[in-house]
């Protein structure tokens, strides 16, 4: 009788722990280092190194990197958005809903900021320093902030969330790998001459704000649901 009660109680406890884990989502390594790096980039750009670092990254390239980054940057326009949504759906429809709403609202905010500031892009600031990269159509205005960097960090952040949920455990290596992919998206925008360091840094910080807020709301709502059950 005692063994049976123990088995029943253990199953109930295991079920409750799984509910709590699904609702209490945290990716501390990803968010911490993303903040440190993008905030650091913002400080460096604000200190007067914005275009000098941008030009250095843009002008020190080679053919293979040109091909890679010109392809990789396009993933922020469709590829990673779909993949992140699919992984979020695999965890739960609620997580996918949070992802979709967050991405949409962030997109509106980024678009509004671009329209408001209408900042010049590197090709407008100094056309003679721009090098030709096959397959890259340069843009000239609405530079601030970087939309590709923002959606890249948000999508890779939600991918990290989804995979840690599917694996039922946090993994620093996974978080760092996806953070590296997010940083590479921002780097590609400077490498291709489409954005400067300030654009990329602010784009990353905006996305990090939306990611953190979305996960906080998800966890807060989830805790209430778990308690109600």
Ranges and model annotations:
Residues 26, 132-229:
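Membrane-embedded catalytic cores of phosphoryl/pyrophosphoryl-handling enzymes
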Residues 6-80, 114-139:
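N-terminal transmembrane-helix/juxtamembrane module of multi-pass inner/ER membrane proteins
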Residues 40-44, 105-112, 180-190:
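Aromatic-anchored segments of alpha-helical transmembrane domains
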Residues 100-112, 116, 205, 209, ...:
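Hydrophobic, lipid-facing residues on alpha-helical transmembrane segments of integral membrane proteins
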Residues 73-89, 151-156:
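Hydrophobic alpha-helical transmembrane segments
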Residues 85-109:
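Interfacial segments of alpha-helical transmembrane regions
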Residues 25-29, 67-70, 93, 97, ...:
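Membrane-water interface of alpha-helical transmembrane segments
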């Amino acid at each position: 009788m005692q063994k049976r009660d123990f088995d029943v109680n253990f199953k109930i406890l295991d079920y409750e722990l799984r509910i709590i884990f699904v609702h209490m989502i945290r990716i501390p390594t990803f968010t911490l280092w993303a903040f440190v790096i993008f905030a650091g980039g913002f400080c460096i750009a604000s200190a007067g190194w914005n275009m000098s670092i941008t030009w250095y990254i843009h002008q020190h390239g080679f053919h293979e990197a040109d091909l890679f980054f010109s392809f990789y940057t396009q993933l922020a326009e469709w590829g990673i958005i779909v993949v992140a949504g699919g992984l979020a759906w695999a965890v739960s429809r609620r997580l996918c809903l949070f992802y979709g709403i967050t991405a949409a609202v962030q997109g509106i905010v980024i678009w509004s900021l671009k329209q408001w500031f209408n900042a010049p892009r590197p090709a407008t600031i100094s056309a003679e320093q721009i090098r030709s990269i096959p397959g890259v159509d340069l843009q000239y205005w609405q530079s601030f902030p970087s939309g590709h960097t923002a959606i890249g960090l948000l999508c890779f952040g939600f991918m990290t969330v989804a995979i840690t949920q599917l694996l039922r455990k946090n993994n620093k290596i996974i978080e760092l790998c996806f953070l590296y992919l997010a940083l590479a998206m921002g780097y590609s925008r400077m490498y291709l001459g489409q954005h400067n360091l300030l654009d990329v840094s602010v784009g990353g910080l905006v996305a990090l704000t939306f990611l953190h807020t979305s996960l906080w709301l998800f966890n807060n709502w989830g805790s209430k649901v778990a308690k109600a059950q």
